[in-house]
Amino acid sequence: MNLTDTVATILAILALTAGTGVFVAAEFSLTALDRSTVEANARGGTSRDRFIQRAHHRLSFQLSGAQLGISITTLATGYLTEPLVAELPHPGLVAVGMSDRVADGLITFFALVIVTSLSMVFGELVPKYLAVARPLRTARSVVAGQVLFSLLLTPAIRLTNGAANWIVRRLGIEPAEELRSARTPQELVSLVRSSARSGALDDATAWLMRRSLQFGALTAEELMTPRSKIVALQTDDTIADLVAAAAASGFSRFPVVEGDLDATVGIVHVKQVFEVPPGDRAHTLLTTVAEPVAVVPSTLDGDAVMAQVRASALQTAMVVDEYGGTAGMVTLEDLIEEIVGDVRDEHDDATPDVVAAGNGWRVSGLLRIDEVASATGYRAPDGPYETIGGLVLRELGHIPVAGETVELTALDQDGLPDDSMRWLATVIQMDGRRIDLLELIKMGGHADPGSGRGR
């Protein structure tokens, strides 16, 4: 091989490496682009953007074309490298006593390492990183060439696609021609968290979006006000009794029951007081103004609960358990607070549900386990309970009195028991048989000998 042939071969290898880079860049830029971004740019962009749109609509075909192009250019690079390596001189190695066979092998090895490394770096890694970092800009530069190549080799691409699809079907899997663009709520939550960490979303927006996306995974049982916290009025109560109950409790909505909450006949709102003249309020029964009550099962998901509550007359629904008994009541305010946080008015208790206290937190016993995790970092194991108060009751095994403590098992980020971290719960206040307030303290390792279960 003369000098001219050697130079031509080297230039051809460089050109093939660049071709590999074009196909790699096209593949990664097309997969990195979101469909909504592609469509938006195509509507108001240049002809290149519309070219990208057409390629994105046939993404599976274009990716197969890119793979075929990468294979062809890589094989051609290897084919041209072999004679070039064979012509490399090795008299220096022979002069130091190395045999021709060993010298040929050594030179071939190092030459292939150099060529392969250059091809990998400049033909694959650099284009890939550029495409991932700047997908739209990269696609505008390379997709036209990629589409033209795929058009010219359409028969070969369809043949290889058909063979691959046949094999995949034999494995019991139906091939997907395009990448899935829809995302589940869990995937969207992960994207929101990543965007917040990178600074693309501010913390407040990310927090609101996460809670909105996670809302549908909650159930009516998790969203409701529990039965023990409901103030009910009887069917023989009057409008005057409604006024007194609203003043005493600070609530605005009350179920009207016949005996107990399992026999709820309607819902009244304090605003209905103004529909009755003052002189008639003492003898006007609540049943005359009560609205029909909506009923939802405790297992209904948050989105469905929202729809039913919004459709009800007073934006309130009673929640029933699997046995048909009333488990609680859910209002539109409950649902909104689950998304935006506490919405307090002049009638609400000013005490927040979680308060930092010394080296721990004072939390309401009615807080759900996931709310405790968000506020304090304590991750509880799964169990037959919904609230932190329920967890403590289960661990104690009896109805406690104020001052009792119990050591709680914690989970790590992978959901496995974390023996290196323990938490101590102390009952601060009881409300009848319900834990109203408790204190959580994070402790390294096991609790000290002075603490224990049910002390």
UniProtKB/Swiss-Prot annotation:
Belongs to the UPF0053 family. Residues 2-205 form the CNNM transmembrane domain. InterPro entries: CBS_dom, CBS_dom_sf, CNNM, FAD-bd_PCMH-like_sf, FAD-bd_PCMH_sub2, Ion_transp-like_CBS, Transptr-assoc_dom, UPF0053_domain. Keywords: CBS domain, Cell membrane, Membrane, Repeat, Transmembrane, Transmembrane helix. This is UPF0053 protein Rv1842c. One of its GO terms (molecular function) is flavin adenine dinucleotide binding. GO terms for cellular component: plasma membrane.
